[in-house]
Amino acid sequence: AMPRIVGIGHQDFEQMITSDNFYIDKTMFIKEWWENNDTVTLITRPRRFGKTLNLSMTEHFFSVKHSGRDDLFQNLSIWQEEKYRELQGTYPVIFLSFAGVKETSFPDARKSICQIIENLYNKYDFLLESDHLNEREKKAYKNVSADMDHNLAANSLNTLSDYLMRYYGKKVILLLDEYDT
């Protein structure tokens, strides 16, 4: 067998697990975080500490987008917990990174953030086909763009979470990375 590689700077959990890199199992973070039942958890660690990889792991664990991906977790400690096997892939998860926002002026940074939000909304276009949104909401949904007005931007994540909650009938897990940009 090939020797395992120590991967440095990996940020995507699936890539980390499937590429046979050496991975320090941090999946019990999922249990600890879930059982804390906090409304908001702030994870502050120094640079290069693996925060993004941890968020990616959390997203892969909970997101409906990754339902049925037992293969990513079956050799990790979280999989020993019967209760958590049932939770894998059963929640709507919004994973948003502001890592790309490097603009120095407020208007430019704002536009960049609004663009990230527009891209996020584009991923959930299926909501427009559903009957969970009324016509007014669908119209507002389509107005989310890089140059949307301040009120629409300020409420956009809350609004999207609300739509996803209606669609899936479950609370939304919102993961923000590089929020301090």
Task: Cite the ranges covered by each PLM segment.
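Walker A/P-loop-proximal flanking segment of P-loop NTPase domains
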Residues: 2-80
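P-loop NTPase motor core
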Residues: 9, 14, 60-127
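Phosphate/oxyanion-binding active-site loops and adjacent basic polyanion-contact surfaces
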Residues: 21-22, 105, 109, 113, ...
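Generic, well-ordered alpha-helical scaffold segments in large soluble proteins
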Residues: 32-36, 61, 116-120, 160-167
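Loop/turn-to-beta-strand initiation segments
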Residues: 39, 92, 169-173
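Structural preference for long, well-ordered alpha-helical segments in enzyme cores
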Residues: 54-58, 113, 160
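Mid-core helix/loop region of P-loop NTP-binding domains shared across ATPases and GTPases
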Residues: 123-175
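Walker B catalytic acidic pair
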Residues: 177-181
